């Protein structure tokens, strides 16, 4: 059964709404990273999986004109698949930020 974005967000402990600054602070202590990409914040996070594919991608969108680290963002998408590293997870996120 395919998980919804809400279910995946809960599994990875991703906030539905936040700021880029808070998201980065949450992810950086666990091998994660974020990248500003136009109106989007792209995230690659780590969540242990014994099969070795422990990275996931996520896409957030700015909800206001404030695109600084304190602007409001909302979760748009979380990858169905997991990846072997954060580069592949970030590539997935870039492909979804349209």
Cite the ranges covered by each PLM segment.
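A short, exposed loop/beta-hairpin motif centered on an aromatic-Gly-Thr core
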Residues: 70-88
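Intrinsically disordered, low-complexity regulatory regions of eukaryotic regulatory proteins
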Residues: 4, 37, 64, 78-79, ...
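Acidic, low-complexity intrinsically disordered segments
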Residues: 89, 93-96
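Negatively charged, low-complexity tracts enriched in Asp/Glu with abundant Ser/Thr
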Residues: 2-41
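Short aromatic-glycine-(Arg/Gly/Cys) micro-motifs in beta-strand/loop hairpins
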Residues: 46-76
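Intrinsically disordered, low-complexity cationic segments
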Residues: 29, 39, 66, 85-87
